[in-house]
């Protein structure tokens, strides 16, 4: 009876498709019979392939999750046949590309079809307020664009291309290798046509035959309100141009936010601090404080204690994707106690201490403001 397929691949039961594929690639490379000659490696390799065969397909995975092996055993072979690898064959080409590319001998795909362009990454820095409120920003990128002279063909205008004689248009060259486990085809990219299956008669002078040119471009992008460090924005079709009529890739903009001297951010809340005098703390007052929306008046209640936190509702960061909802602005009150007072102030404070029935010493007033002042 086969073991648990999740345990065989070393993944959790809630692993996504990419995690399962990565685990399979790692284990298949390790236990492939052409690589691992240890006893039991072949059997382990078959288990790994069976596990991937079941877990890589949503339908069979769902049956396995619900009924176990009984849900997938009907009509499914217990062994693994190299000639019927399905999507696994594509992974094999990737896994063993370092060994010259190992295939199954059944694939003869041409590589002359459209190829999507690569995605690109751009790191972009915002100041604190730009991250809070968003807005439109201009960026500059360098990417590959389709050559306007040859329209992406790579051929000099008025000339064409012919089928590569080295690979007969397949874009691949193969070499059969016999092993104790059967005959395998080692596959590599054709060195003559670089995998295109065609050879250009005369290269385009503008792009050197590649069909694409490196260009610098200015773009305006919209920064949504409430972004934070690590927020990723996708700009469709602004990556590298595709090849042979393929679509362009996408541009991914990764945002970072500069620190602010006055404000700190915690989730969608903003934090700041202000200092008031001990008299303002005792008597209370009205003050103007800075917020990301501008100055705002707050009330310091009489008897406010050090480290009191005042909350300004809806003065924080807009929630990403729902800018109507905002966090709060939390203001910590620091009370400044003077280290020295002049004689007149001291006399008044001593009278206050006497009224309150509190003692004081040479080093300062004890009790209400005890031990806080020095001559």
From Swiss-Prot:
GO terms for biological process: chaperone cofactor-dependent protein refolding; DNA replication; protein refolding; response to heat. The lineage of its organism: Bacteria, Bacillati, Cyanobacteriota, Cyanophyceae, Oscillatoriophycideae. This is Chaperone protein DnaJ. Residues 4-68 form the J domain. Homodimer. Keywords: Chaperone, Cytoplasm, DNA replication, Metal-binding, Repeat, Stress response, Zinc, Zinc-finger. PANTHER family: CHAPERONE PROTEIN DNAJ A6, CHLOROPLASTIC (PTHR43096:SF10), DNAJ HOMOLOG 1, MITOCHONDRIAL-RELATED (PTHR43096). Zn(2+) 1 binds at residues 147, 150, 204, 207.
